[in-house]
């Protein structure tokens, strides 16, 4: 959820939270259900790779 995304990425509410949420939704559609640790790792990698 958005609160967890903000905590993990240490970001305030805003557009980036929605983008991260969409990334996780797409990831789940592509890969199927993931455990929390794998999802967090993917989220952090996605965030670090952003321009």
Please describe what each predicted stretch is:
Residues 1-51:
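Charged substrate- and nucleic-acid-binding regions of tRNA-handling and nucleotidyl-transfer enzymes
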């Amino acid at each position: 959820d958005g609160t967890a995304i903000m905590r993990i990425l240490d970001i305030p509410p805003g557009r980036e939270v929605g983008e991260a949420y969409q990334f996780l939704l797409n990831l789940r559609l592509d890969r199927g259900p993931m455990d929390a640790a794998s999802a967090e790792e993917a989220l952090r990698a996605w965030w670090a790779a952003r321009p």
